[in-house]
């Protein structure tokens, strides 16, 4: 097997390919710039800004210390009505039976 040595000095980069047209630059952005996303009223509800993002507030922030006891802490965090109804019957109204 003969190994061929290519001299880097004599290597010429190929010209532009005839298959592809030269890339046209993107047109400049419109001036004046377009409105930002929330510049007009947000979502059609008459809010000048999007509603602030807040994490879920703690139960302490809503209820303070010891306002609700018994089954209410469970009911506050209950996700489904079925779960709440079962717990109310089993826990809160146990004294009726």
Swiss-Prot record:
Membrane-topology annotation of the record: Single-pass membrane protein
Locations listed in the record: Cell membrane
Membrane-spanning parts: 68-88
Feature: compositional bias, Pro residues: 15-27
Induction line: Induced by salt, heat and drought.
Keywords for this protein: Cell membrane, Membrane, Transmembrane, Transmembrane helix
Disulfide bond positions: none
Tissues and organs where the protein is expressed, per its UniProt entry: Mostly expressed in siliques and, to a lower extent, in stems, roots, leaves and flowers.
GO cellular component: plasma membrane
Source organism superkingdom: Eukaryota
Keyword Transmembrane attributed: yes
GO MF annotations in UniProt: protein homodimerization activity
Predominant cellular place of this UniProt entry's protein: membrane
Record's keyword annotation contains Transmembrane helix: yes
Region (Disordered): 1-27
Physiological role: Involved in resistance to abiotic stress.
Family: Belongs to the CYSTM1 family.
Complex formation: Homodimer and heterodimers. Interacts with CYSTM3, CYSTM4, CYSTM5, CYSTM6, CYSTM10, WIH1/CYSTM13 and CYSTM11. Binds weakly to CYSTM1, CYSTM2 and CYSTM12.
Name of the protein: Protein CYSTEINE-RICH TRANSMEMBRANE MODULE 7
